[in-house]
A protein has these predicted regions:
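Catalytic domains of carbohydrate-active enzymes, especially glycoside hydrolases
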Residues: 6-32, 123-132, 206-210, 276-284
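Glycine-rich, aromatic-flanked loop segments that form ligand/cofactor-binding clefts
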Residues: 21-26, 49-98, 133
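Active-site-adjacent "subsite" loops/lids of carbohydrate-active enzymes
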Residues: 1-2, 58, 75-126
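Aromatic-lined carbohydrate-recognition surfaces of secreted/lumenal glycan-active proteins
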Residues: 67-77, 133-134, 156-198, 251-264
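Active-site-proximal loop/short-helix segments
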Residues: 31, 38, 78, 83-84, ...
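Aromatic-lined carbohydrate-binding/catalytic grooves of carbohydrate-active enzymes
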Residues: 17-52, 141-143, 147-148
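Substrate-binding cleft of secreted/luminal carbohydrate-active enzymes
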Residues: 208-222, 234-302
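The substrate-binding groove and active-site-proximal loops of carbohydrate-active enzymes
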Residues: 1, 38-52, 101-115, 152-160, ...
Length: 302
């Protein structure tokens, strides 16, 4: 599917269904910034790949009254890590910056990395987004023992670094009129600590307006929630995960899961959605290719 066909498909979904929100990449997993920014760091990184501007957002809103979310990837940034090596996590065994499956992580305590991301978030907000959504707002999900950080890698430092960044972002972005959300791993709804990545449910919820746990059935290990193959039980797995979060005190209004829009049939995707809606929750749906079926969604009456 080419870009024009894909965009036409999304426009059809917007006009024919009850979908009212779009999540749009502002800074991607590969470190590219997709709008014209005044950040001095981008002059060094040469990472601008301009795809849209404020006028583009206004054109989208002409389709319908859309709520627009800018997705900004935070601590996974190969361009920043390779350019400013002193801001990246170091691999002492191989004497180089740390990488995990071609992903390069910045040290979450790096002030330069934090300031850079926050400056982009403020600019995206000023351009016309309603909300800034931070993704990869975490430490690497790895037990690799040779990672070297600026600070000792323990629960307190991890959660402090994640929550302090989000708290600073929330304060700055609220002043600009934007709400703030964080994408978190689905298992964080169940795990009572931080999963080794700095995401603790009880503390992170205080630092943002919304959390979007990625409760993808395909990402749960065999046996999770009592199901040998969780991916075969989308409704039950999503429902159980969300129950864990709600039972731990997350307000319904703040719990807005990311649902699985890949590797599933239309019926399975609709089960994901039904599980969230049965708990009176708003939701987002994720497909890395931005390919969505019209039949996932509730159609508007003609």
């Amino acid at each position: 599917m080419n870009k024009e066909t894909k965009m036409n498909s999304i426009k059809e979904i917007l006009t024919k269904t009850n979908v009212n929100t779009l999540v749009i990449d502002a800074k991607t997993d590969n470190g590219h910034v997709l709008f014209d920014t005044q950040s001095s760091e981008t002059d060094i990184l040469k990472n601008e790949r301009i795809k849209y501007d404020a006028a583009t957002l206004e054109e989208l809103r002409k389709i319908k009254d859309l709520y627009l979310i800018a997705r900004i990837v935070v601590f996974q940034d190969p361009l920043f890590a390779k350019t400013f090596k002193e801001e990246a996590i170091f691999d002492s065994k191989n004497n180089r910056i740390y990488s995990q499956n071609e992903q390069y992580f910045l040290d979450p305590s790096s002030q330069r990395a934090r300031d850079y991301t926050l400056s982009l978030a403020v600019e995206a907000c000023q351009m016309g987004f309603n909300e800034i959504q931070f993704d990869y707002i975490r430490y690497p999900d790895s037990t690799y023992q040779y990672m070297v950080f600026k600070e000792k890698n323990n629960y307190l430092n991890r959660t402090n670094n994640i929550n302090s960044f989000l708290g600073e972002a929330k304060e700055a972005l609220h002043k600009e009129g934007c709400l703030v959300s964080a994408d978190i791993f689905g298992f964080i709804l169940t795990n009572t600590e931080d999963g080794g990545i700095g995401q603790n449910l009880e503390t992170i919820i205080e630092s943002v307006d919304f959390i979007s746990p990625m409760v993808y059935p395909s990402h749960y290990s065999n046996g999770s929630f009592g199901y040998q193959y969780p991916n075969n039980h989308p409704y039950e797995v999503v429902s159980a995960a969300l129950n864990d979060g709600l039972e731990r005190g997350v307000p319904e209004i703040q719990l807005r899961p990311f649902l699985q829009g890949f590797w599933h049939s239309i019926a399975d995707v609709k089960e994901n959605i039904e599980a969230a809606e049965d708990k009176n929750l708003d939701w987002l749906i994720w497909n890395i290719l931005s390919t969505y079926e019209l039949d996932y969604f509730t159609k508007l009456e003609s």
